[in-house]
Amino acid sequence: YFYEIIEKIDGVSLYNVWHTFSEEQREDIIKQLCDAMKQIHSNIGEKYDWTKTMQEKFMPLYIQAKNLNIFNEEEQKLLDYAYSKFNKYLDSNDFVLIHNDLHFDNIFYNDGKIKLIDFERSMYAPRDFELDILYRMIRKPWKFASEETERYTDSGDYTNIMLYIEKYYPELVSNPNLHQRLAIYDMVYFLEQLVKHPELEELKNDVIFGAKVVALKDEITFNDVKTPMELMDFMNVNIEYGWIDNQGFKHLNNLKGFRKNYRISSIDKMLEVGLGTCIEQAKMIKYFFDKMGFENKLYCYRSYETEENFDKDIRMHCFVLFKYNDSWYHFEHSNRPKRGIHKYDSVESAIEDITSGFKDHGDIRKLTEIDSIPSGLTFKEFNNFVNEFDDTKRKKI
């Protein structure tokens, strides 16, 4: 153990000022942070059984969660399978001293320079464990902000941080299994929160999402799927509702920064990261039915206050209907309460039921049948694409 008495640090939490910086200033600050991490990580520790450490953290929490009946049978099977992969992904040789609580309330800023505070959780661990808190903060910055600074957090301001870390500290992100390792760390972290607050569905979803990421590499591939039910099973395991921003960062079940930073992902990208909005999911569902020879219809429904306000206050839902044995079905995955394959007497009755949930929002409502969803468009560009689509297929309802 070592101790150091330091003088009072001048400055403010980085959370207080991050939103005011230019991108050039942000890059310089992350470069300083990388230099500070390198200095801390230069203290090499002895190797120990990291896999066993994480297993011993996870299992008592998991048993407690099962005793609380938090997870259903299907979810337990997924978690059991993900746990069986800890040995595969957690083997480590690179043990260093880490800060272990790096978020912006523990980084002080003054006159262009940063200083780190609050080293009480420091430990020797694999180098990438430093990202456990830091990467989670990048994805959900408001979670680690104080009550005073939370109002300044906009996830769009954090999208380039990992790019700068890769540039100035590539060793920190060099593990080939980094994606799975960070997902395991998430499983442990969110499970610990969940057993304290079992009523919070968001925490449960975070644990399940981490397990799906760990299991993703070994599951059935999209090309193996042959029937609508197999497609639903595949998507239940491999696709969560979320989006990828224009820097490639993932956002699970939150829309902060969506309008500013969203780009429609390709099917391959959605499968790679396991996230998609109703737009990407409808794109993939239509692709599947086209490939399998099912007659199908792809729709985009929008409701908004006025024509002039279409890109500011709009609700949108993309969905697919398909025909099987002379009946029409709605294949819904992205809308969790409606998830499933639903049979209807006609296309019209399906549309009436699907769009009824949006009737209370906005005076202008449009339903447009489209034949494709281009990748790479912003939300506004996609809305324009749909609005300008073949007028003969557009319905106002």
Annotate the PLM regions.
Residues 213-272:
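Secondary-structure boundary elements
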Residues 129-173, 186-200:
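Active-site activation/catalytic loop segments of kinase-like enzymes and analogous catalytic loops
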Residues 1-49:
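ATP-binding pocket architecture of kinase catalytic cores
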Residues 323-396:
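Active-site rim recognition segments
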Residues 4, 38-41, 49-89:
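Active-site catalytic-loop/activation-segment of kinase and kinase-like phosphoryl-transfer enzymes
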Residues 2, 81-129:
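Active-site acidic catalytic loop and adjacent metal/ATP-binding pocket
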Residues 283-356:
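Hydrophobic/aromatic-rich core segments of domains that either
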